Amino acid sequence: MQISVIIPTFNEDQNIGQLVEFILIHGQDSVAEVIVVDGNSTDSTVEVAAKARARVLHCATKSRAAQMNLGAGEATGDILYFVHADVKLVDSFVNDIKDALTSGFDAGCYRYQFDSKKSILKINAYFTRFNRIMCRGGDQTLFIKRDVFEELGRFDERFVIMEDYDFIQKIQKRYKFRIIPKSILVSDRKYHSNSWLRVQLANLTIFIMYLSGVPPQKMARYYKKLLDYR
């Protein structure tokens, strides 16, 4: 069982080196490769990732769905693990993933907590333990058997945002999905330039739009109007 870790990036030179090094150290012989798929960064993300011994791919489109699909297409492992660049994984991620898959699950994620002591963000994090689609998200990372990923048709590249919700919904309709009862650490940077209430209202609005079948490009445009974020 070999794991290919796929990390989509855009201007992540402050995070990517440490993350790649952590994965390679704790992945040992079970991580086949760390693939960083860059979406035209204007900082030194590519150079930092390469120096940390990641395999770097260049995606013409700045879109996590397109970037992750490109990485998956180049991956050699039989397990794909999609990770955002601004998270900190648990040391036991390899064993956790293997245990879940050998126990009959086909895909899964972690709970998370924020790298902040704010009580209100702890409330957000608490809900990631529940098996409800609105409690999911790419920040929780996603592992999946490669054959299941291909059978489901990969990420829908029409979605510039909400690609993770869309794909996890597809998984849960046909396969067993595991939420590992451990928490990874997620950056609270989205809240630095937006209030907690503003982020929650934006997320709720976009989620309702998604469930209502609003076209992906319209959701993306509206989300950019709602939040000041990257």
What does each model-identified segment do?
Residues 38-46, 87:
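A conserved acidic beta->alpha catalytic loop
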Residues 14-18, 43-52:
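Acidic helix N-cap motif at the loop->helix transition within catalytic regions
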Residues 92-119:
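Conserved donor NDP-sugar-binding/catalytic core segment of glycosyltransferases
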